[in-house]
A protein has these predicted regions:
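A sequence-composition feature that detects small, non-aromatic residues
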Residues: 15-20, 119, 129, 149
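Glycine-enriched alpha-helix->loop->beta-strand junction motifs that scaffold or abut catalytic
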Residues: 39-43, 123-128, 154-155
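Short, electropositive alpha-helical surface patch
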Residues: 100-128
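Hydrophobic alpha-helical segments and helix pairs
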Residues: 118-144
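Residues at alpha-helix caps and immediate loop-helix transition turns in enzyme cores, especially N-
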Residues: 26-28, 114, 118, 142
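Active-site-adjacent beta->alpha loops and helix N-cap segments on the catalytic face
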Residues: 56-59, 86-96, 112-114, 136-156
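Functionally constrained cores in energy, signaling, and assembly domains
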Residues: 8, 12, 75, 134, ...
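N-terminal capping/small domains of soluble enzymes
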Residues: 1-103, 109-110
Length: 156
């Protein structure tokens, strides 16, 4: 059992983006959720990483199989940072989540000032934690300056 500094306790966590932007699964997982084969409410879920502005990433909704491969015992993906941007999430997804039923960890990626701005935007939601995605192996970008972004808002 892991206990966060805010008191949230969890034993199992779903990896960033594995259950989409709402913690309830990608469209190809919905039938498994409906059948009870995937139960998001059993986990603390890290949502798909959000960026300040929309990014196309690698996922194409009309052919997701180009980014997702099933392997024995699971799957791997190269979705990258496909997302519609944090403002979309804050207006279209975040307000409609049941944070009591689905403990959600936010995930953000960006430059230092963007990280601070996005963290403030997500502060209006009942997230159990916030992940700063320091690097995504499918974007070709270098590691970000996460430490300086955190210190800029939390000086010692």
């Amino acid at each position: 059992m892991i206990t966060l500094s805010n008191g949230h306790k969890f034993e199992y966590m779903v990896a960033s983006g594995a259950l989409a932007f709402d913690g309830k699964g990608w469209f190809w997982e919905k039938p498994l959720v409906w059948l009870g084969l995937i139960k998001p409410e059993l986990f603390t879920v890290v949502i798909k990483t959000l960026t300040r502005y929309p990014r196309p990433g690698n996922l194409r909704w009309w052919k997701p199989w180009t980014c997702v491969r099933l392997i024995p015992g699971g799957s791997v993906n190269k979705i990258g940072l496909t997302n519609r941007g944090i403002e979309w999430w804050c207006h279209e997804v975040g307000p409609y989540l049941d944070y009591e039923k689905y403990p959600i960890v936010g995930s953000i990626y960006g430059e230092e000032k963007e990280l601070v701005e996005m963290a403030k935007m997500l502060n209006y939601f009942n997230l159990v934690a916030l992940e700063i995605n320091d690097s995504c192996p499918n974007t070709g970008h270098e590691f970000q300056k996460t430490e300086s972004a955190i210190k800029s808002e939390n000086p010692k």
